[in-house]
């Protein structure tokens, strides 16, 4: 099932050359509300895949849409032994047009600067990122990531703290 789904995404976007495929989604609203994210991580060379997810008690939707890729790249660097021995070609798939345009440097990377700074550093050590836009829920993996991101966000909603002044 997973291999046919990966092939569907490869065919949909005409992806051929890559070492790592990341398909993710985020769920958030405003900075004072919880956010969640999910990312399908596929290392083509090792034929290893997993779903990464996370969230926090704050975060805008744009923050949540970017978080899966920063975290997946950080995870990948750890899996590589914290050192890249050669360039690593990464295909990133997102339904966030803003995230993709910032990733491809059509828009500036000034919003969510801490995450973009980390991504910039990862690019400087050899990650070659290609950002691809897909419409929302147009493949099974994106649908799965959308659902997991929303569920993860809800986990943090129940733990929301009072942000009032003391």
Question: What is each stretch, according to the model?
Answer:
Residues 46-49, 63-66, 115-119, 155-159:
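Glycine-rich loops and low-complexity Gly/Arg-rich segments
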Residues 27-31, 70-146, 153-155:
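RNase H catalytic domain
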Residues 51-55, 121-126, 161-165:
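Short C-terminal domain-edge/linker segments immediately following a structured domain
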Residues 2-67, 71-75, 79-81:
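RNase H-like nuclease fold core
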Residues 147-166:
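Charged phosphate-binding loop/patch that engages nucleotide di/tri-phosphates or the phosphate backbone
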């Amino acid at each position: 099932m997973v291999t046919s789904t990966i092939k569907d995404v490869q065919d949909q976007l005409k992806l051929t050359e890559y070492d790592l495929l990341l398909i993710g989604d985020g769920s958030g609203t405003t900075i004072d509300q919880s956010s969640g994210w999910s990312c399908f991580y596929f290392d083509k060379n090792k034929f290893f895949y997993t779903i990464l997810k996370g969230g926090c008690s704050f975060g805008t939707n744009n923050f949540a849409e970017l978080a899966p890729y920063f975290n997946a790249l950080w995870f990948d660097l750890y899996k590589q032994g914290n050192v890249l021995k050669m360039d690593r070609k990464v295909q990133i798939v997102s339904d966030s047009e803003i995230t993709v345009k910032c990733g491809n440097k059509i828009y500036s990377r000034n919003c969510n600067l801490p995450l973009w700074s980390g991504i910039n550093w990862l690019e400087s050590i050899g990650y070659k990122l290609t950002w691809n836009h897909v419409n929302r829920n147009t493949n099974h993996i994106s649908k799965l990531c959308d659902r997991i991101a929303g569920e993860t966000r809800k986990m943090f909603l129940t733990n929301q703290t009072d942000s009032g002044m003391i």
